[in-house]
């Protein structure tokens, strides 16, 4: 399964949407590397690339939330921590195996892609709506 950015994932915040597209691209690069090479080193390097960008993106989102005094920021951070744990678990899977297995790919699909879709459609969209509503009320 490849991750796809479609209209259902648009939050209306250009920065967030652009970063989500990049995040999805990095997830797909990880999946592609698992298909084209069963090499453990390649998988670890590609997972590093995804993990680094995820940290950058989470930092940007959390800074945005702080700047708009988003009331559910702590809950949002806990959701980010869930994906951090998933990424750590993926590293552990790679450590225990010779390379990316079918089970590894299944975990990326289930615990990264599905998590990301739910997170964007719920948490991130609510942040973008809150920001938009605050900006709209300030103009009145």
Please give the residue ranges for each predicted region.
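Small-residue-biased structural context
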Residues: 1-140
